[in-house]
Structure formats: C-alpha cells, structure tokens
Regions:
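Short alpha-helices
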Residues: 111-178
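Active-site cofactor/cluster-binding pocket
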Residues: 65-67, 72-122
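Hydrophobic/aromatic ligand-binding patch that stacks against planar heteroaromatic rings
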Residues: 41, 100, 139, 157, ...
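Short, motif-level signal for alpha-helix interfacial/capping segments enriched in acidic residues
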Residues: 3-8, 89-90, 140-142
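Generic enzyme active-site microenvironment
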Residues: 22, 26, 85, 110-111, ...
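Hydrophobic helix-and-loop "lid/oligomerization" segment in the mid-to-C-terminal part
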Residues: 2-25, 33-62, 72, 76-80, ...
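Short glycine/serine/threonine-rich phosphate/pyrophosphate-binding segments
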Residues: 29-35, 91-95
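A glycine- and small-aliphatic-rich helix-loop capping segment at beta-alpha/alpha-beta transitions
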Residues: 41, 99-107, 142, 173-174
Length: 209
C-alpha cells in the first residue's frame, strides 16, 4: 500500500462534498462492510455520502444498522463530486451502475484487494491482502477521519467473512494488526463472528432435535 496513493485518495475525499460509493453485485460482507465503513466515516466528517449496490443486502448480513442505508438505485437529484468503488475487481461487477461509473466526468477511485483487478478507475488502490476491509481503515485514517465503533464493526464484518474467521491462508500479520486496531476502536468481533459462523437457522437447529 503506497503512501502516495493513500495521500491522493485522502485529498480526493477531503476536497469533495458528495461521494457515491459502489460495491459489486451479490454483495458479501467485505463489499458491504468496506463500503459502509467509508460512507459512515464520510458522513461523520460532514460529507454527503451514499452506498449503492445493484442487489439488496442478504438477510444474513443485516446484523448492523448501517445495512439499512444501502441503495439499489441512484438517489434522485444528487450530483456526485467523486465516485468510489470498493471490493470490485472489474467494472462489470458494478452491474447496473457500471455505465454511470464509466461515463462519470469527475474523479473515480477503485479500492480493492483482488489481484485480478484491472485498474479501471482514475485512481486505483489495489493491495493483495485478505479483504478490502483490511485497506479501508488505512484510507479512513489517511483522510484524518476517526474510526468509531460503528465503522470498526463494519470493517470487522468484512475481515471476518473474507478471511473465513481468520482461517484462510492469505491471512497475514497485517490482517491481525488491522483487526487489533478495530478491536481497540470497539469492534465486536465475538458477536459478529457468532452471527456469521456459529448461529444456526431455526430449520437447521430442528434437524438436531
């Protein structure tokens, strides 16, 4: 993760007033967690920020309040200064928003952890790591924004789900370093981990009765 790229993205975030954040179709915990963490940080800093995804939030991921803020269409009457895509390796993964993103006249930022990312934005921060939620906290801090408990929980969701509860081979020392910082900011790793990996549906539980 280069300091120059972080500084450039921080400059873009701080110099704009209205930001659109997009994630990939059929969203997972990392896509939603990273996007909503950034949106929440921007809102806390007095910006207007919107999170958009072609598909609705899956029921199993509706464990954090911010999930209610995800839009499946562009907000009417809003003129964006900056567009940011998260956890999206190529433009087609933005689904119905791909054409809007491609034609946007202002700056676009692409933040992702997939090695296959094709650098489709004007500014691309692509780091090979376990999750985009391993990158987003660094972006937020570089912009001088605070990581609150709400933000930490959202980033924790992405770290947990994309790392398989820290069981995948791409988990590194830095993954745990970021996790420790999020825990220090109040992230409920035990609670989120339970919801994602241990809680059983009623129907599944009945199989053992």
């Amino acid at each position: 993760m280069t300091e120059n790229l972080l500084k450039e993205i921080a400059k873009q975030l701080n110099s704009t007033k209205v930001v659109g954040v997009f994630c990939h179709v059929r969203p997972d915990g990392d896509a939603l967690g990273s996007g909503l963490a950034l949106v929440t940080a921007l809102k806390n800093s007095g910006k207007a920020a919107y999170m958009m995804c072609e598909d609705a939030v899956p029921d199993r991921l509706k464990i954090l309040p911010a999930m209610e803020d995800v839009l499946t269409s562009l907000p009417q009457g809003v003129n964006f200064d900056l567009l940011v895509s998260v956890d999206c390796a190529d433009l087609s993964r933005l689904g119905v928003f791909a054409a809007f993103y491609k034609k946007f006249k202002g700056n676009t930022v692409n933040i992702d952890h997939h090695i296959s990312n094709d650098r489709y934005a004007k500014i691309n921060l692509v780091c090979e790591c376990t999750a985009t939620c391993e990158i987003i906290p660094e972006v937020i801090k570089a912009a001088g924004m605070s990581i609150t408990k709400d933000i930490a929980d959202l980033a924790a969701l992405g770290l947990l789900t994309d790392s398989g509860n820290f069981s995948h081979r791409d988990v590194t020392e830095n993954t745990f370093k970021v996790a420790a910082e999020l825990r220090g900011a109040g992230a409920d790793f035990p609670g989120i981990g339970y919801e994602m990996f241990s809680r059983q549906s009623k129907n599944r539980a009945l199989l053992y009765v």
